[in-house]
């Protein structure tokens, strides 16, 4: 894992979120959702956001690096805009404990996982990036903010 790339990605994403937040006069979390949409489709009138997203793509982050970047970004967000209790993300320790239990109880190479109430997807991302198995994962969340 390249921590310099994670720091650069964090800086680009944070700047983009702040630009979008100011432009739309919205919350950090809503601006983050907008940033994700802009990253995927590239449609925005905000030139600095476009430049930062191009730089993000050039970093070619791996799955684990994306996960860490977003964890740091969400921790930053929680400093300025507190999350509701049901919006808190799953700590890595819980994810690694679940991975250990799954790997011990299910020795098969392929595992299907269903996570009801997947929230921000941090636990699911931990499964997908850290397990030594082929995973068929489905996370379901009803809260559209998450």
Language-model regions, residue ranges each:
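Conserved class I S-adenosyl-L-methionine
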Residues: 109-119
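Generic hydrophobic/packing signal
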Residues: 73-81, 102, 106
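A short N-terminal interaction module
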Residues: 1-77
């Amino acid at each position: 894992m390249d921590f310099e790339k994670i720091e650069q990605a964090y800086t680009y994403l944070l700047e983009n979120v702040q630009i979008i937040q100011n432009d739309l006069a919205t919350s950090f979390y809503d601006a983050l959702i907008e940033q994700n949409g802009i990253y995927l489709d590239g449609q925005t009138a905000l030139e600095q956001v476009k430049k930062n997203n191009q730089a993000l793509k050039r970093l070619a982050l791996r799955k684990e690096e994306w996960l860490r970047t977003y964890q740091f970004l969400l921790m930053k967000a929680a400093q300025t805009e507190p999350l509701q209790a049901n919006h808190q993300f799953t700590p890595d320790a819980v994810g690694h404990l679940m991975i250990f239990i799954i790997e011990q109880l299910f020795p098969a190479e392929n595992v299907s996982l269903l996570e009801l109430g997947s929230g921000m997807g941090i636990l699911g991302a931990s499964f997908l990036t850290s397990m030594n198995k082929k995973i068929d994962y489905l996370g379901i969340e009803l809260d559209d903010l998450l």
